[in-house]
């Protein structure tokens, strides 16, 4: 059988980059396989996926050497429009691939661009919505969807032209457990239809039953590969050596259950009394019971997409005003200005808070202790990237840059919204160790997360919004 994906001696160097991002990559993938690209953040997974869907070098200019053919299309030679019907793509952030403001139009968009007649488009939209069980999402505003719902619609849109190959780049990094289960089912549906699936992913537990082979990248090179059986036989310590996350979350979930029963540790620093969250008094999001956060503790905040975790964080740090109730700082009511002065928020989409021309400048922006910059950069594996532009980094590397800036801010309250989104096991552990160091300084950390491995290993207690 002819491979649907074939690469030999592939090198790729981004424009203005001093070193290649991919080096001597050689592999083949057979039709109908589900393969997973794994490795530490910045190892080249995303760049490789861009070669498969034609985004590199068409939209991400650079020098390509070697041969990389996906679905019969040669990277660097085929026109980008030739990839559209053959290769479907789902990105880490679904907002980056939306072209319409309602879900039905978003699904129809690929077919409209391909010149299909209206009746055929309507039939495909109906059939795709049925196949992926997203009929209730049709006709909805994309601005009113949860993160998981947005990713479902993006996945369905990528399948509208019946591609031979699906390329998924960190599709679950911002999803809750229920949304991840739905993503699993969508991938399973496409695999059953004979579609080849290539996943670049750090989270492994949700997809192990569907993956046929694993490709491990390190420093831009393909250094190891395993069949599903070989990967399942790897001892846990080997996974840790490779910087890979666990194959199962059972132990993590048991630990989180224990931590959900714990109360505030120590004297409360920040308290909430019947605080109502939302953007409009006529339609409040939710009212919280009394909550307390102690100095020197790490609190995980969990719950499904759209439940109000980020709204709570924005309210606590002074970016939003509560619709009702009282927020106190060391027993005294604190207004938005006071809360903003005492807190640092690391956003879920860190692209909104990257302003400087180099990684080092970004980390030092607003730093209270610039003398600690080198130490923090070293701990977060950013030392070799000091002079790089933040927007030239991988998603996981950008996340670490903003986390580093938070570490140097010297704010007593640090709120982290999905701080390990897109991070490998080693980087997640580094973030956890730095959180512990901040805790030792008496700081309070509120960590909004779907990352069960992070919550189980590093949070003192867990609050789950339901």
Q: Residue spans of the language-model regions?
A:
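Helix-to-loop junction immediately C-terminal to a conserved catalytic motif
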Residues: 53, 317
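ABC ATPase C-loop
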Residues: 159, 406-407
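ABC-family nucleotide-binding domains
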Residues: 176, 424
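H-loop/switch region of ABC-family ATPase nucleotide-binding domains
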Residues: 201-202, 449-450
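Conserved ABC transporter NBD signature motif
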Residues: 61-74, 325-339
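Conserved ABC ATPase "signature" region
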Residues: 119-137, 371-385
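Conserved ABC ATPase signature
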Residues: 141-145, 149, 389-393, 397
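Catalytic Walker B motif of ABC-type/P-loop ATPase nucleotide-binding domains
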Residues: 166-169, 414-417
